[in-house]
UniProtKB/Swiss-Prot annotation:
Name under which the protein is recorded: DNA-directed RNA polymerase subunit epsilon
Taxonomic lineage: Bacteria, Bacillati, Bacillota, Bacilli, Lactobacillales
Reaction(s) catalysed (UniProt annotation): RNA(n) + a ribonucleoside 5'-triphosphate = RNA(n+1) + diphosphate
Gene3D superfamilies: RNAP, epsilon subunit-like
Pfam family, one: RpoY
EC number: 2.7.7.6
Assembly and interaction partners: RNAP is composed of a core of 2 alpha, a beta and a beta' subunit. The core is associated with a delta subunit, and at least one of epsilon or omega. When a sigma factor is associated with the core the holoenzyme is formed, which can initiate transcription.
Length: 73
């Protein structure tokens, strides 16, 4: 499954919508997606959203869509 992860670059600064960034990743489930991001980055995760069907198609066509790869631990 493909997940869209909204995050802040670090956990120290309070989250602001204007500085929210996005990454796309593949994982078996939402828990695994969160674990992989937390284990491999200093990011403050705001939201993880599963992308399927029309949502996935839209993101591929209209966003800077690139899958980020993390090592599973």
């Amino acid at each position: 499954m493909i997940y869209k992860v909204l995050y802040q670059k670090d956990k120290i600064v309070n989250p602001r919508r204007e500085t929210t960034q996005t990454l796309y990743m593949e994982a078996d489930n939402m828990v695994e997606a969160r674990t992989m991001v937390e284990d491999n980055t200093p990011y403050n995760i705001e939201l993880i959203q599963e992308l399927t069907g029309n949502s996935l198609t839209y993101e591929k066509e209209h966003a800077d869509f690139k899958l980020t790869k993390f090592d599973k631990k």
